[in-house]
Regions:
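PAPS-dependent sulfotransferase catalytic core
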Residues: 65, 238-297
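Secondary-structure capping and boundary motifs in well-ordered enzyme cores
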Residues: 177-180, 200-204, 258, 299
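Short coil/turn segments at secondary-structure boundaries
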Residues: 190, 194-196, 224-227, 244-249, ...
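Short, hydrophobic/amphipathic alpha-helical patches that form generic packing surfaces
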Residues: 38, 175-186, 190, 301-318
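ATP-dependent adenylate-handling active sites, centered on carboxylate activation for C-N bond formation
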Residues: 1-149, 190-237, 312-323
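Long, Lys/Arg- and hydrophobic-enriched amphipathic alpha-helices
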Residues: 22-36, 169, 193, 283-289, ...
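Glycine/proline-rich, flexible active-site/cofactor-binding loop segments
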Residues: 132-173
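Structural motif
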Residues: 163-176, 223-225, 289-306, 316-317
Length: 323
């Protein structure tokens, strides 16, 4: 099979024709759809009906934003060393991480504070990025109607929040992320049901999750290895240098290249927009965000989310004949 980047449909508005896929709403893995289509065919042709995936590896064994509080409770001196490492390797202000480590807010208190910042359009405290939930930053290309809708929904949840999934931010985020990946696994089974393939992701197994949650937060960090906890569990089953730290992959570079090739056509294709017709986005601002996203990866994610939602709405309209 060709490299994943050559299949990408990140900025492609070609309609989705699979009814099971449309039932799932705008799927998070839409950009990999063409690759997965070919992968399913290749697996079926090989005579196999079982495919293992690595879903959950990053969530279980890598750094999560809520890690700093757990590190501090485990060992303050060790936490300071890891905070210093994160400050230099991820370019995060040390004072921000330290405030997050010392902050003892409950899940509900965090939701209430984030909700208030959204309502007042004030900038959330930077340390909230490393607490229970990240600050909700409504994109500038949302319309007033769309903004009000998001604030209303979030405020309702903040006023009567469900119980957190975990006892601390790290457990909450780990369980939440694994739950999301489990949802992706279910979607694959639904969308590719006709292939007869049993899609499996062993790292999303409940016993694996429980084992990781029982481990120390510091076990996720090592000066030389990525995912040291997983490396220790795998032991000699993997080559000795398999988990050595490597430079950042080229996935983001691929997305930038794809956007550069598609942005002019995409801008034109969005001259009419199902999202804009719903009134939840500012049409001109949305097109500008797609054509000229911010220079950060987040800007590209914004553009990707716009395309994913727009593609889904157009596909639903095409299949149902409704506007």
């Amino acid at each position: 099979m060709r490299p994943l980047a050559e299949y990408s449909s990140t900025f492609d508005l070609a309609p989705e024709t699979s009814v099971p896929a449309l039932y799932e709403g705008p799927i998070a893995w839409a950009a990999s759809r063409r690759y997965l289509d070919d992968l399913a065919l290749a697996i079926a042709k090989s005579g196999s009906n079982l495919h293992f995936m690595g879903l959950g590896g990053d969530e279980l064994f890598d750094y999560m934003p809520g890690t700093v509080r757990s590190l501090w409770l485990e060992s303050a001196p060790r936490a300071l060393g890891i905070i210093r490492h994160l400050q230099t390797s991820r370019r995060i202000k040390g004072r921000t991480l330290l405030r997050a480590a010392l902050r003892g807010d409950s899940y509900q208190q965090t939701l209430e504070r984030v909700s208030l910042a959204m309502q007042q359009r004030t900038k959330a405290d930077a340390s909230d990025r490393y607490s229970w939930v990240p600050p909700m930053e409504i994109p500038h290309w949302f319309s007033d109607e769309g903004r009000a809708l998001v604030i209303e929904k979030f405020s309702t949840i903040a006023a009567h929040p469900p119980a957190p999934l975990g006892n601390d931010p790290l457990a909450q985020q780990t369980i939440e992320s694994i739950t999301f990946q489990g949802g992706v696994l279910r979607q694959l089974s639904e969308v590719y049901a006709a292939s007869g393939i049993d899609w499996q992701a062993p790292l999303t197994d409940i016993e694996v999750l429980r084992a990781v949650l029982r481990s120390r937060a510091s076990a996720r960090f090592h000066p030389d290895n990525d995912k040291p906890l997983l490396a220790a569990a795998v032991g000699s089953a993997a080559p000795h240098d398999f988990y050595h730290k490597r430079r950042r992959g080229d996935f983001t570079t691929d997305v930038h290249v794809e956007h550069g090739k598609r942005r002019r056509a995409l801008f034109d294709e969005l001259s009419e927009s199902a999202l804009a017709d719903l009134g939840i986005v500012d049409h001109a601002a949305m097109r500008a965000a797609v054509y000229e996203p911010s220079s950060t990866d987040l800007g590209l994610f914004d553009a990707e989310h716009i395309v994913t939602a727009e593609r889904w709405l157009r596909s639903v309209e095409q299949i149902t004949g409704r506007n």
